[in-house]
């Protein structure tokens, strides 16, 4: 297993999107990319979503990409949460709950969990939320 830590390259992965297409991390990279581990049943994840949506709407055109990795097991609930919370970025899930291979690959023990990547795909920070997350993303994008 590759070590997943700050300063290291993020490990590539691919998984099905809600519409059944396979999406990979490599094709989702922007100037800054957030890998966001969450689930429809995770209260703290859903509470954080409005902050992430606002940040994405403000900074996507400046180079921010997000790929959501869900630990859901029910496809309908996953898709419903994406629509209800207006999560317009790329999403993937193998619908395997805590057996989600990408969560295991990234050694995710609890959610929400975030990994912030630079333009080269290196992990520069982990598990930031709210203002701290936005500040780090803006710093990486060179946005005031």
Question: Where would I find each of the regions flagged by the language model?
Answer:
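Active-site acidic short loop of glycosyltransferases
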Residues: 29-31, 61, 87, 108
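Long, His/Glu/Asp-enriched segments that create or flank divalent metal/ion-associated functional microenvironments
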Residues: 38-41, 48, 71, 76, ...
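Alpha/beta-hydrolase fold active-site loops
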Residues: 32-33, 112
């Amino acid at each position: 297993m590759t070590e997943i830590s700050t300063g290291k390259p993020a490990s590539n992965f691919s998984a099905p999107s809600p519409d059944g297409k396979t999406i990979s991390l490599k094709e989702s990279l922007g100037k800054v990319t957030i890998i966001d581990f969450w689930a429809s049943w995770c209260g703290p994840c859903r509470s954080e979503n409005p902050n992430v949506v606002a940040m994405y709407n403000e900074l996507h055109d400046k180079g921010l990409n997000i790929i959501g990795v869900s630990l859901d097991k029910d496809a309908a609930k996953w898709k419903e949460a994406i629509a209800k919370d207006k999560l317009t970025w790329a999403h993937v899930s193998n619908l395997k709950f805590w057996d989600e291979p990408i969560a295991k690959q990234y050694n995710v023990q609890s959610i929400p969990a975030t990994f912030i990547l630079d333009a080269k795909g290196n992990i520069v920070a982990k598990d930031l939320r709210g203002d701290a997350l936005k500040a780090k993303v803006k710093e990486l994008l060179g946005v005031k």
